[in-house]
């Protein structure tokens, strides 16, 4: 009998996804808005992003298909492969970014060379992959409990031991841009969530638990980053830990949070690759992705990822919008064609619209209006085609 994951196990997986150095670093940007507006942007952005994340997870959970297999239902067997390739590329990028950030922060506490930390983190991710998602139970529970306690200590140091410092607000960083930066993080997990909800005993409940846990933890991480910049005047998390005397404990936060998050990226890259080439074994592709990501983290500087996050949004926001329209509104059956050109053209229109909206300062960012308009376009096109057939 196939082993299924419990609600608790799914919650742990997405807790690990949320506890991330990259999320803390992204949170530091929000200090430019001040605490009140910064917190509002974090909450609004995560609410938008997590609703989309939930809907994507429900599609995969109900159909028992991986994220990229569900994409084929809307875009055709070959059209879906286009998104699988784009997803693998973004996951290789994420793997490299996460290892780079983790190694940089770990090096700030215990200096042995950036490349050494890249290799250590990369090796631990490979161990996580080889253990496998359905066998991680007790290992993940211990790691998550330790991370949670240490993160609370970090929160206490920042918010209760620090004092507000003079932080120069950035007038060019608008509330809408901040919302978009908050939406971008849950949106980046959108092409992955079904890889985990499809394995759940209760897929819809597991999706709800996963989304809520990730949303709360991710907001908390953003808040820690923003608080670090506002209350300590320091955006380098490693230095905050050093000054607080966390030392080895801080090192553990950095290394294990990087491992538990990046494991999901590499694992899903493997699952997505199975949608491109049926003969590939996802677990071994995930190992290869980790190796490539480790090399990338050693060789290339990856300090500013905002453009990368916006690129992810422009590709995957209109993609899930088409899927939401097909699955929940139009209730279309699986596309039997190689390329569903109609949906691919709607996605392209959504992609272009997102890039255009990036030049317009909108209060709620560009993801929400882009997705609403893309869904509306799907419904209109379906109605017009239905009339022609009638």
Where do the PLM segments sit?
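Hydrophobic transmembrane alpha-helices that form the core helical bundles
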Residues: 80-112, 259-275, 318
